[in-house]
Amino acid sequence: MNLLIKGGRVIDPSQGIDDTLDVVVENGLVKEIGKGLATSAGAETIDASGKYVVPGLIDMHVHLRDPGLEYKEDIISGTRAAVAGGFTSVCCMPNTKPAIDNKAIASYIINKAKTEGACNVFPVGTITQGMHGDRLAEMGELKESGCVAVSDDGKPVKNSELMRRALQYAAGIGIMVISHAEELELVGEGVMNEGFTSTELGLKGIPRVAEDIATAREIMLAEYVGAPIHIAHVSTKGAVRIIREAKGRGVKVTCETAPHYFTLTDDAVRGYNTNAKMNPPLREADDLAAIKAGLKDGTIDCIATDHAPHHLDEKDVEFNEAMNGIVGLETSLPLSLKLVDEGVLNLSQLIEKMSCKPSELLGLGRGSLKAGNVADITVIDPAKQWTVTESALASKSKNSPWLGATMAGAAACTVVGGKIVFSGR
């Protein structure tokens, strides 16, 4: 399929481009970008007037639940949700059943995604075997099989010596370690952020310091061995400060946050709303402000969703018993566009955090519209108004705290490898 994407505002931070231009796609690759372009006879033309044309969005942190938990989500439904949200690539976390701790599981995911998925899927392998936290996984084998990072996401690696060795080994073979930073003894039986709201609701709280201490440990270990570390789903003002200070002294630390941490506070839990229960939990207003400040000054490198689908039966229970996590692939873009409206980021900075930087950190070879690159492209309609409903979501699971909310902004067209895989709501 050959394409001419015409008259859109092309924003490509990798090339410093922000202008009204045309994009020509031929044989699955970007052929050229410029004004007044034409393409071969029979090419499909996409009118991008009034829209943004950007490198395909990349979500470096999703849970596709495949294999083993397909009643929540699978590669087919998860990638359909991804392209509906404008994502052309996703990185799937390894807390599946069985976990992605060997070549066979990684190969299964890659092969299924190639034959049945709607977008690129890059698996993340485990740090430890079975995510049990006692023995390192075969990281070299995982990298060779196509894993782009390693993580025990969903829980931390408690053993500091094991984490030190993981960082050393991963650095030696050139694969990123993604840390779920959480001090479990401080978390205890907590189910939401510790503070005024948890006290008022009579729910056991999780103190911010549980994340802060674990973040500091990871940074100190990485600094000690001279290895890179990536901190997942940053949610506290303390973690932002610790990461900012570490970057200032040259530590190879990067991090991500998720849209719910810069749009919601723990007030969303009122009414015991289980669709506002996730890990890390929603924090307070000063944490939200710190997350925005971290995005603005570059402390926070990436925006990821931590898309975590759960079946209704796992959410329609008492708050204490409900599973942690929310779906986020289809709401991430409009929520993140609010950062531009608020002056936190400009459009180029937003696309950098949602496409270019994730690709750079994980070595995906995406995140750019340079001629010759794979044509992964997202066309964004910033004026599109739509309502989040269960029927509007492509994900198998509907556990979103924004059900019933009206969103501004959506993917108008998602192109993966030169093929149109989604054409708007």
Curated annotation (Swiss-Prot):
PROSITE patterns reported for this sequence: DIHYDROOROTASE_1, DIHYDROOROTASE_2
Reactions performed catalytically: (S)-dihydroorotate + H2O = N-carbamoyl-L-aspartate + H(+)
Cofactor binding note of this UniProt entry: Binds 2 Zn(2+) ions per subunit.
Pathway(s) the chain acts in: Pyrimidine metabolism; UMP biosynthesis via de novo pathway; (S)-dihydroorotate from bicarbonate: step 3/3
One of the record's GO cellular component terms: cytoplasm
Cleavable signal peptide: none
Record-level Gene Ontology MF annotations: allantoinase activity; dihydroorotase activity; zinc ion binding
E.C. number(s) listed in UniProt: 3.5.2.3
Recorded family membership: Belongs to the metallo-dependent hydrolases superfamily. DHOase family. Class I DHOase subfamily.
Database matches in PANTHER family: ALLANTOINASE
Protein's name according to its UniProt entry: Dihydroorotase
Lineage: Bacteria, Pseudomonadati, Thermodesulfobacteriota, Desulfuromonadia, Geobacterales
